[in-house]
């Protein structure tokens, strides 16, 4: 959007505080300023109470909304984002995981799966070369099979595995 001279609002759930309060980062080190979803929604409910031709935010016309770590959204936040698409005709693109380390849907992911117009999977590959569909939590070289669904800032790590190697507990060759 930026390359095309358009303005995209970057958002993240308040749960995601790993990269600092007002920033999102990629695994390769790219960073961009972002706002918390709930703060944005409070502001727009005040700003956009009328149906205008252009919806402004920070003095700029909003062309799109991008949400990082969308799995951490609440179902209600997902519904509000769908209202932005339907009633304000602003595209909302959400990026995140489908399932947790136990292969259960996150509540935000579940709601996105239920109402999203389009779902595109970005394929990830297991160490064996097969499609990785399991976000595997591990600690001390062993797969973790119990614990809190959301674990930020812990000593545990995550690796993408195919379902077979997840079931077998094989983190690598």
Regions found by a protein language model. Give the residues of each.
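Conserved D-loop-proximal element of ABC-family nucleotide-binding domains
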Residues: 75-76
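Conserved catalytic network of the ASCE P-loop NTPase/AAA+ motor domain
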Residues: 55-59, 84-88
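Conserved AAA+ ATPase core "coupling" helix
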Residues: 123-143
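Conserved P-loop
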Residues: 1-55, 100-111, 121-124, 143-145, ...
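Short basic (Lys/Arg) and small-residue
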Residues: 116
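Walker B catalytic acidic pair
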Residues: 68-70
